[in-house]
Structures are given as C-alpha cells and as structure tokens.
A protein has these predicted regions:
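Glycine-rich beta-to-alpha active-site loop
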Residues: 103-147, 169-170, 174-175, 179
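Contiguous mid-protein beta-loop-alpha structural module that forms a pocket-lining wall or clamp
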Residues: 154-214
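Glycine- (often His-adjacent) and acidic-residue-rich active-site loop
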Residues: 59-98, 148
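Amphipathic alpha-helical blocks and their helix-capping loop/short-beta junctions
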Residues: 193-261
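Catalytic-core regions built around general acid/base machinery
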Residues: 42, 95-106
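Hydrophobic/aromatic residues within transmembrane alpha-helices
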Residues: 57, 70, 125-126, 181-182
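Conserved CoA-thioester-binding segment of acyl-CoA-metabolizing enzymes
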Residues: 1-58, 101
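Gly/Pro- and small hydrophobic-enriched strand-loop and loop-to-helix capping segments
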Residues: 129-151, 186-201
Length: 261
C-alpha cells in the first residue's frame, strides 16, 4: 500500500477508530489519483466492519491538511496526451467525485482535522465529513477559478448552503477565509488549537462507543463541544462584511457582478 496515505487503526475500548493521514508534505498533501483510491478503498472497507466505529482524516505536517488536487500531476498527464483524451485526469476527477459522494453519505462518524491550508479538493474532503475541525491557522479557499476550472468537489452543494451570497463570493473570487469564517458559513463545526489534536484523538478513543451510528454520532458531537480551545478565534472577515458581499453578488448577471467587485 502506498505511503502517500497512512492507514491506521487505534484502539477505542474493544473497538477501533480508523485513521487516514494524507502524507505528502512536500506538496502540502495535494491529492493524487492513488491517494483518492486509498481513501475510497479504506472507507468502503471500514463501513462494513462493525469493530470500526469512526474515522479520522487528517494531514501530515503543520502546514496543511490538503492543498487540493495535485495540479502538477494533472498538467503532466495532459502534456503527455496532447489533444486528449487524458486518461489520468479523467480517471482522477471521476474517482475524486465518487470519493466526495462517499464522504457525504458515510454512515459512521467522520472527523476531519482541517488545519492549515485547506483548498479545493481538500475542502471537498473537509466539507464531506460530519465533524469538521478548524484551527488557529486554518486557511480555506476554492481557488479553481484562477486556473480556469470551476468550484467542484461538491461545491454546488455546500456553497449554496452558506449565509447570504457568501458561497457565490468564494466561488467567484477564490478568497481565503479563516476558522472564524468557516464556523460562520458552516464549513467548520468545531475549533481547536492544532496542538490539541493528540488530546482530542485520545478523548475520542475514550468514548463509550456502542457501534450504533446515531448514538455514537451524538457522543462525538457532545465530546467535541465539551472541549475548550486553547487559543482564541481569529478575527472574523466575512460576517462584518455580509451586507456588502450580498450587494456585490446580487443578481444573475456575472458581468455586472464582476464590475461591482
């Protein structure tokens, strides 16, 4: 098995918690097709194992959870297939989108530790998990528009569920937001200092797991809500400007929106 995703199971009483750690620090844990396949395969396997009560997804290192798809690998594959079809890119996106759907529909508790850079495909993973931890250095964005792509990986679902016109604003400007903003617009559910990760994982392992999805989900929610963050939230960037954002993003005429921005 590839070491680009570290697969582990750690004890939680007489059960286990699965853990998937994106392990490509040099590329800020950017997703490759191989990584997507490992994540999907493990999630599907754990879904059918009663002893696995939850899954934690995090990233190696202190800089990033995941900077998105490995654009360099996608570019290289297209150069190698001038004029197309580009099998690598087609397979990558097809598999990535299936992985996103699997995350959104996963029955067991999914806890994502979204520290540092969380961009594009990384945000797709975070948004698909039920329990979405953000930290003091979380930096979230959907930068696809800057490379002539569109906000994918479930963006049409989670962007449209944000307050006001924030989803459209993030999609059209590729602006970055912090943990406070993530909590405000629903991309984050819990805030902790990054250095608390190990203690949070240990607390999860200490829960009285029942192998009952509904009961276990309630317990995870209660546990995470009961832990106090060791750092203060960063200053809000979205909420203070929601009226302006709504005004700029109003209507269906994109040219008019761009003129206002």
């Amino acid at each position: 098995m590839s070491d680009s995703v570290l697969v582990a199971e750690y004890p939680a009483g007489d059960r286990v918690i699965g853990r998937l750690t994106l392990n490509a620090e040099k590329t800020l844990n950017a997703l490759t097709r191989e990584m997507v396949d490992v994540i999907t395969d493990r999630l599907e396997a754990w879904a059918n194992e009663d002893r696995v009560v939850a899954v934690v997804i995090d990233g190696a290192g202190d800089k990033a959870f995941c900077a998105g798809g490995d654009v360099q690998a996608l570019r290289n594959s297209s150069v190698e297939a001038p004029g197309g079809p580009c099998d690598y890119a087609e397979h990558f996106f097809a598999r990535e989108y299936r992985m996103n759907y699997l995350l959104h529909t996963y029955a067991k508790p999914l806890i994502c530790w979204g520290h540092g850079v969380v961009m594009g495909g990384g945000l797709g993973i975070l948004a698909g998990c039920r329990h979405r931890v953000v930290s003091e250095r979380t930096r979230i964005g959907m930068p696809e528009i800057t490379i002539a792509l569109f906000p994918d990986v479930g963006g049409s679902w989670f962007l449209n569920r944000m307050p006001g016109q924030i989803g459209r604003f993030l999609a059209l400007t590729s602006s970055h937001i912090n943990a406070t903003d993530a909590l405000y617009c629903g991309l984050g559910t819990h805030f902790f200092a990054h250095e608390q990760k190990q203690s949070v994982l240990e607390a999860l392992a200490g829960l009285a797991w029942e192998s009952n999805v509904e009961a276990d989900t309630v317990k995870v929610d209660a546990l995470l809500k009961g832990i106090t963050a060791d750092v203060d939230l960063p200053e809000a960037q979205l909420a203070p400007h929601i009226d302006v954002i709504n005004e700029w993003m109003a209507g269906s005429n994109l040219l008019a929106i761009f003129d206002r921005v």
